[in-house]
């Protein structure tokens, strides 16, 4: 019970001391009266005697007037002579003199008689309530009620959706009440006997009369001699407490430190059963009608009239006590009880199977406050730790008059409060738009308290009458919460209230997307006030953005129309709350970086920088999830970008900056959130680790709660997923893997040799670089695709023009992924930076080559190609990039490996492999602009050549005003059947799965065909198109069409029909454009349905269909064969019927590819078929085959193969 001593020490009764030296007080009046010496009875007063009424005290003073004192002859009553006396009597009287003659400049409130006395000699849990309610002086505020909502059963199913629905109506009030449907009655585990009678909780002592009307603590103790008096008094009380077993004397000095602030002291512990008894006794005694009572305080129940005051009476009495109390009213409140320790009032999901279906329903409900913070759509799901009171609910067990003072939620979050049982709880709310008005009104009415504690509203210990707020122009609304009802508070809405009796409520926070702007304001205020944060706002903001990108990816590419994806898709808009908040935050970050970080070292922040513990600025406690500043003098000490100069006194050159993302990457994220599909594609691959192909790394993928995909890489895999997964390879291995068309993407790499050792603190630095791709270079060899770009190899020559002999086989690997939405500026080749071969660096650039735009319900990314002129793999050329900041990382020379961040990109790798074999060169360079064709943006990628002026050679910005207006192009009125002469190039292999076939056709992976159609670049001519089926990942095919003469023109979709429909739309777009330019002899606009996608792929050709059917020997394509129960494959076809030489321009007739028993394949065909088979085999299988062929007769092998074929048939 040492807390009792603390409470006594902080008391202000009879401890009010003047603020000037004794004997020099100035009095308002000069009434002469005799000085009354202290009597023996005065010294022996007990706390019970001190609580007598003011009338009795006046009577005692009149009776004591008869006593004579030697010093009563002094004629100067305005001078306090008691301070000059040396005898013990006058010294003992100093306290009384100080309390009777207060300093006029120190507005210390006079002591009030005790209205509640807790504990006695017989028991410590009883109470004596001497105060009585004053119905004639009630001060019930005249307020409007907050809105009440009654959701239907259907509306009640989706918690956050319903809150979003009522927000426009309720937010202006700051608070509202939600009454669940009558059928929603969750069981309460707290009412179980073992909890009700066995679990104890702690309470807080609240002085209701001091919530509004109290003096500043600084005015109570100003002088040292007065402090000594209070200390002596506390020590004396401490000794008495020790005698009574209540504490120890040293506790008194501890209490002295708390004189500087006002707060709620800890109270005794109770069980729910005992606290209900205590609360009911208080209310019954305070509001009882009759004055009859027994002398035994512990049996006060016998004299209580059993009646319940009206709620209006309780409200009026409460605000009378707060406004103008006549007694000390002390109550207890079980506030902020952690449900993780004491237990929740809602059922939790149990691992046992004994739970009933009804309990399971409530345990999984979105209105269960244990589930509420992390519901789908709440940003708090991205907070990994269980923050008590924010993500873990708190319990509030109240009694009559127990209060919660004016405050807003941490980070201005939403809060939801549910009352499990008990008397009503009265709430008062002020809308977020009026929060500043309330703060100004409270500072005006309580200036001394705010001067002493500027952050007083953060302490939750100050109340102010709603009537006074209303007078000050602050709109306040009342809300009465009953058992079984919810109360919802909105962001930055101030709220306060009290309980009208014994009750139990539970509350927790939530953060829907519309909270983000309020949360941003909150952290800026916290930074100014130097207040600690509870959650990482930037982490939640980026988590929401990633979720939107992931939803866009799954909806557009995987057709996952789930409820969660549709919910997040709704936030994917340029003018949406998420996009605006993210853009504002990035603009703020850009400004700070440009202002501070231009001349300093910038490093890549590790992904686990704040994974285990929150990183905060050591100056203002700003969250450091996105960026931080540090110094070498203190490795574990960081600051925000604003306070980097105050971090330490070291020179500026010793400082460094940590960035989770560079600004270009963040800009990509903004575009992705705004709905730009190219940015969605790039960010999904770059940050989330999502890819359309999973063949490259045969690894398992797991998606965490933030939407990131984590893969478990295999030892042979060189293509990695995720930004932070790194693979070390030697330069020879890099060269070898590139020759094997290794799948490397996502990161721009610039590898150089390094002679000196570089410390880890110099691992990344911002650099600028412009490069140009020169197609006239005879050393142009091959390009590998990166994410939206390509990897090119070229020999780096020294300044003398000779090839650097120290360079490795593929000296420089530059992965450029620049996407240009505007005409690019001319750059210069930075060969001087890499010719010396003295440093090994890694340079990263954001992706800028893929351009995808969502213009249909379902679309897929365009995987582009660059460079029409591709030859043998020998050297590397630089690719054009924007003039932009990039990040450079120096790698220590002690290792012979390059740390390569890479990502699996099976789709782009497959495209690139065919670029080297199918490209004939000579294609016209086109500008890298997105052209909306109705289904997807068609991307023209700038190839190796471009004009020196930087102007695109084929611009799409032709204005209609530049040409004479003509009538529009003709439209074909009849859909004519195109004579499709489809030429199969490769039949591929059949895969099992419903997505790899339909009732109409089988879709073999790797199938390729060739057909002639209108040229999208020159509609007056026809050209050849290559149709191909790729593996899109997630066990589904992806259909791709591209120009054989210009592989940079790519059309990709999940449907063959839609894929060719996009080609038709692009043709019509070009026809319209050239018609406006005045060109004649143009074909008519192609109507919808012409051409047919299945026909253009070759599925109308019986020979091709039969060849594909023959591939499915085991009939794994069940949907296709179920629709053809009497069909069976007639003959086997080779998987690769036609392998053309790269330099062959002739066309082979492949109509008669059917193999008869006597058919002989040419030696070239045999080699090609064997190569295909060998590539499908593993190293172990190839080694075994080599041993068998070297030691066994070939005839035996032939017989075994024939036997196996017969068995499989």
From Swiss-Prot:
Stored PANTHER family: LYSINE-SPECIFIC DEMETHYLASE, PROTEIN JUMONJI
Keyword hit for tRNA processing: no
Catalytic activity field: N(6),N(6),N(6)-trimethyl-L-lysyl(4)-[histone H3] + 2-oxoglutarate + O2 = N(6),N(6)-dimethyl-L-lysyl(4)-[histone H3] + formaldehyde + succinate + CO2; N(6),N(6)-dimethyl-L-lysyl(4)-[histone H3] + 2-oxoglutarate + O2 = N(6)-methyl-L-lysyl(4)-[histone H3] + formaldehyde + succinate + CO2; N(6)-methyl-L-lysyl(4)-[histone H3] + 2-oxoglutarate + O2 = L-lysyl(4)-[histone H3] + formaldehyde + succinate + CO2
Keyword Metal-binding (UniProt): yes
Major subcellular site: nucleus
Co-factor remark: Binds 1 Fe(2+) ion per subunit.
Disordered, as annotated region: 872-900
Record-listed E.C. numbers: 1.14.11.-
Gene: JMJ16
The protein's name: Putative lysine-specific demethylase JMJ16
Assigned protein family: Belongs to the JARID1 histone demethylase family.
Domain spans labelled JmjC: 361-527
